[in-house]
Amino acid sequence: MPPVDNAYKLRNQEYLQEYAQKPGVKIMFNGVMYREISKGSGPKPSPKSFVTVHYVGKLINGKIFDQTQKGRPATFRLNELITGWITAMREMPAGSRWEVVIPYNLGYGSRPAGAIKAFSTLIFDITLLDVR
């Protein structure tokens, strides 16, 4: 395993502290944070639900590491996603759009995952289109 980049880890922790102070931010029981961009009125998913979403995933420097293609949403079984997504999506009514901020321990953790460095805070813009 590569050595820990303590400066990067600290920047990610500072980002979480700053984000928590923004107006409209809600902090969930395990540290996942979100800001409601638009409110939906559909059902909330259960862990075994299939969710159809549009999303953009970014790091704290603004670099996009993953996203759905325009006009082509993605469908996932909720309980197969990272813990931070599961936590947020369980409270998100279909039709909603949220900005979700996930601490590293509820994302990809202390190990790198592709272009995502260890200890990365993940920022997602998620629109929940459908729950089945």
Which stretches of residues belong to each language-model region?
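Cross-family detector of peptidyl-prolyl cis-trans isomerase
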Residues: M1-R132
